[in-house]
Amino acid sequence: MAILPILSYPDPRLRTIAEPIKTVDAEIKQLIKDMIETMYDAKGIGLAATQVDRHIQLIVMDLSENNDSPRVFINPKVTPLVEDKKPYEEGCLSVPDVYDSVDRPVKVKIEALDADGNAFEEIAEGLLAVCIQHEMDHLNGVLFVDYLSRLKQTRARDKVKKYLKTREKQLQHNKA
């Protein structure tokens, strides 16, 4: 397994629309393992393939407290089941150190394939509903900051640049 580099906002590759996966082969299964390891390493709860510069419809997620229940969503489709929206505080591995509130439908239906290519569907509410919608946005080239005002988007971009500079300095210092 390998930890993959995660693209950071405002990288234009994050705006790429993901293509459906035609077959769940050994390469896809390896990517799933690598994405799960990457998500855990980055202390995230969800990761879309777009974020690791693979523009295919693949999401991994683990909402458990112990990081012991990874889930896989291949070629997912999400349908809101209610018009009611609720604000949720969101963050993103591609927009490090930025958190803000986004209104999302509170109940959705998920249709997808699992890691073995088997179709499933489920009704999601709460954190699962929020997380799957957030990750689906990535597959469509949308980031949670797109829902924010222009001012907040500018602040987010500046904060990410500062975060990445600080992280780069720390990495260089650790090598010395």
UniProtKB/Swiss-Prot annotation:
Q: Which residues bind Fe cation?
A: C92, H134, H138
Q: What Gene Ontology molecular function terms does this protein carry?
A: metal ion binding; peptide deformylase activity
Q: What does this protein do?
A: Removes the formyl group from the N-terminal Met of newly synthesized proteins. Requires at least a dipeptide for an efficient rate of reaction. N-terminal L-methionine is a prerequisite for activity but the enzyme has broad specificity at other positions.
Q: Which residues form a coiled coil?
A: none
What EC class does the entry list? hydrolase
Instruction: Give the organism's phylogenetic lineage.
Output: Bacteria, Pseudomonadati, Pseudomonadota, Gammaproteobacteria, Moraxellales
Q: Which cofactor does it need?
A: Fe(2+)
Keyword annotations for this protein, in alphabetical order, are: Hydrolase, Iron, Metal-binding, Protein biosynthesis
NCBIfam families, per the entry: pept_deformyl, PRK00150.1-3
User: Any idea which residues are catalytic in this one?
Assistant: E135
The name this protein carries in UniProt is Peptide deformylase
